[in-house]
Each structure stands twice: as structure tokens, then as C-alpha cells.
A protein has these predicted regions:
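Catalytic phosphate/metal-binding cores of nucleic-acid and nucleotide-processing enzymes, i.e., regions
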Residues: 1-155
Length: 155
């Protein structure tokens, strides 16, 4: 891959998917729960990875732009037909468990309105319109949401 930033982003996407699949115990390629990198679809981007009912937008950059990223993730969730979009921002010098997972206030409100997350870690609120978990905490949220919800079509 000629573009170093693109190569770094692709590595982060793969690392992130491998991490969350390992934490949740997903490994079979036909398992609908497997977190998978999404194919590039052109003008209507559908996120970097799919973790039903979330799309994951991975970011491996030094300077965060979280509100902009969240607008992107929310639009990509709509394009993919998923209810929720989140951003997974790599933290330099830390492993994937410590990455930051950001969710917009609006999306978080819909999530807690649809699911009982009382047993899950509480995300840190921001004054800029979003909440944040670590990737390890988000994996527990994903597990809880999936226990109550599954896609209409299981592969």
C-alpha cells in the first residue's frame, strides 16, 4: 500500500476487529456476530467495520475531530441500514482495549432507550455532544445489546 496513512488505518481496522472478536469469543467466519471489516462501496460509505447493530468508524490519527467523525459515523450507519454508528479512536502507545469509543448524544439516547444497559460501564459524557467508553467497555455494551437483539437474517 503506497499511502502510509491509509496503511496505518487499515492495520488499525484489522487490529480493532480482531480485538473485539477475541474479547467476545467470535471466530467462525459464518457467525453473524463476527465483527468484520466492511467492503468499500463508493459514494455511500457504510463504515469501516460492522458489529451488528453498530457500524464502527476507525480512526488512527494524532489530532481528534470527534464531532465531525460522529456525523460521519451516523451517516454511514444510515447507509448501511444499521441503527447505531460509533467511532473507535486509537490511543497512541496503548493497546486496543484502551482505544476510545465515541457515540453521539443523540445515538446514545436512542441506544439507552432501546436497551437496558444498567449492567454496562457508564460512558464519560463530553460537553461537545458525545459520550466515550474504552474499547474494552464498549465490547461489554456490544455483548449486552446483542443478548437482547439479533439481525433479522442470520448467516
Amino acid at each position: 500500500m503506497a499511502n502510509p496513512a491509509k496503511a496505518r488505518g487499515t492495520r488499525w481496522e484489522s487490529t480493532g476487529c480482531t480485538y473485539v472478536n477475541g474479547v467476545l469469543g467470535y471466530s467462525h467466519p459464518a457467525d453473524w456476530r463476527l465483527v468484520k471489516r466492511a467492503p468499500q462501496t463508493g459514494a455511500k460509505d457504510v463504515g469501516d467495520a460492522h458489529a451488528w447493530p453498530f457500524i464502527l468508524e476507525y480512526k488512527d490519527v494524532k489530532s481528534p475531530s470527534v464531532p465531525t467523525w460522529l456525523r460521519q459515523a451516523d451517516a454511514e450507519a444510515i447507509n448501511a441500514g444499521f441503527p447505531y454508528g460509533v467511532v473507535v479512536h486509537k490511543v497512541r502507545g496503548k493497546g486496543p482495549a484502551m482505544a476510545r469509543v465515541h457515540i453521539s448524544d443523540e445515538t446514545f439516547g436512542r441506544l439507552i432507550g432501546a436497551h437496558d444497559l444498567t449492567a454496562c460501564p457508564v460512558p464519560c459524557p463530553s460537553s461537545r455532544g458525545y459520550h466515550t467508553w474504552t474499547f474494552a467497555e464498549f465490547a461489554e455494551v456490544l455483548r449486552t445489546v446483542r443478548q437482547a437483539e439479533s439481525p433479522d437474517i442470520q448467516q
